Amino acid sequence: MIIHNLGIKDYTEIWEQMKEFTAVRDSNSYDELWLLEHYPVYTQGQAGKPEHVLNPNSIKIVQSDRGGQVTYHGPGQLVAYVLMDIRRRNLGIRTLVAKLEEILISVLEHYRIPANIRSGAPGVYVGEKKIASIGLRVKNGCTYHGIALNVNMDLSPFLGINPCGFAKMEMTQMSHFHPNIQLEEVSQHFVQYFLTQFK
């Protein structure tokens, strides 16, 4: 597993790089984890419906090829893209999603933030509020896209959409529990727990 810390990047640029990486990889290619933040952007998943974008204002909307509905990415949100040959690892996509949810819950528990999952609504929640989203694409047995964890960001752009297709879905973030939390530190803990699941 190769880990890349990419800083803050344009969504479309990284999406193209993920597709290119996945298209040229072979059975000997290492799996990779890309850690980054994005400039403000709304992304529609393959199941995304236009009516879930309520008021985008000046924020760009990108029609993506990941699973799921519309979400928002912006600075202060930890994005981790999982470029993994799940066929080689004998993993199903549902098992991978469940493992990613476990990793996110472990990170949150490290900070004593009580997190949970919800049946039929992938991602991680604190009470009824969503704190992390998951959206993946599988091509030729290999995944790309991944997770987004709200760390210390401006949540107001989520008000311009129905997050993940749920009307009035409230969002939360780690800084509500730890005001001085740093994304870099959270990223390190994410990698630590990720590598306990995936060598």
Curated annotation (Swiss-Prot):
Organism from which the protein derives: Legionella pneumophila (strain Lens)
EC number(s) stated in the UniProt entry for this protein: 2.3.1.181
GO cellular component: cytoplasm
Gene that specifies this protein: lipB
Stretches of the chain forming a coiled coil according to its record: none
Main subcellular location: cytoplasm
Entries under HAMAP family matching the protein: LipB
Name of the molecule in the record: Octanoyltransferase
Keywords: Acyltransferase, Cytoplasm, Transferase
Keyword Hydrolase: no
More about this protein: In the reaction, the free carboxyl group of octanoic acid is attached via an amide linkage to the epsilon-amino group of a specific lysine residue of lipoyl domains of lipoate-dependent enzymes.
Gene3D superfamilies: Bira Bifunctional Protein, Domain 2
A GO BP annotation: protein modification process
PROSITE patterns: BPL_LPL_CATALYTIC, LIPB
Family per similarity comment: Belongs to the LipB family.
Gene Ontology terms for molecular function: lipoyl(octanoyl) transferase activity
